[in-house]
Amino acid sequence: MSKIIVASANPAKISAVASAFSQAFPEQSFTVEGISVASEVRDQPLCADETLLGARNRVKNARKLQADADFYVGLEAGIDGGFTFAWMVIENHKQRGEARSASLPLPPIALEKIQQGIELGDVMDDMFNQQNVKQKGGAIAMLTNHTLSRSSVYQQALILALIPFMNEQWFPCR
C-alpha cells in the first residue's frame, strides 16, 4: 500500500487526490493523509508563477515533515488576470509531475474584492451567502451551479500531473 501525503488539510483537495490516484492506478491501494504546510507565497497568489511556486513549496515542506511517504502532492489555487485556476505538483523519490487545472472566469465584482486583498473563498462566501465555500465545492461549484466542483476540476488536473508516473518509460527521472 502506497502512502500519499497531500500538502493541505482541505477536504476538497484530499478527496481530489484520492480519486485521481484511484483512477490512475486502479490496481493499487493507497492511504491518503492531508497535512497543513506553508506555501511560502501570498494567501491569494496573483499570477501563474507564484501559484506554481506555492504548490512546489507545499511539496517541499510536506517532505520535511513526513519523509516516509511514497508520493507528495501540492495543490495551490491562484488568480491570473480575470481567471482562477490551480497548479498540481506530484513528487516521489525519483519523479515530478506538474499540471494546471482549467481556468474559471471570475465576475468583475469578485476581482475587485480580490484586488482589495480579500481571498477568493471569502469573496464567494459573501457573494453567495455561504460559509467555507473553499472547503466544499469552491468558486467552481458556486459559479457553475454545482455542475462542476473544485474537487472534480482538480481531479482532472491531478491525473494529468500523474502522466509521468503512469508512463515512466517515456519520462526520464528528474
Curated annotation (Swiss-Prot):
It is an enzyme of class 3 (hydrolase). The keyword Nucleotide-binding applies. PANTHER family: NON-CANONICAL PURINE NTP PHOSPHATASE_PRRC1 DOMAIN-CONTAINING PROTEIN (PTHR34699:SF2), PTHR34699. Substrate binds at D68, A69. It comes from Photobacterium profundum (strain SS9). Binds 1 divalent metal cation per subunit; can use either Mg(2+) or Mn(2+). Coiled coil: none annotated. It comes from the Bacteria. HAMAP family: Non_canon_purine_NTPase_YjjX (MF_00648). Homodimer. Belongs to the YjjX NTPase family. It catalyses: XTP + H2O = XDP + phosphate + H(+); ITP + H2O = IDP + phosphate + H(+). Mg(2+) binds at D68. This is Inosine/xanthosine triphosphatase. GO terms for molecular function: ITPase activity; metal ion binding; nucleotide binding; ribonucleoside triphosphate phosphatase activity. Pfam families: NTPase_I-T.
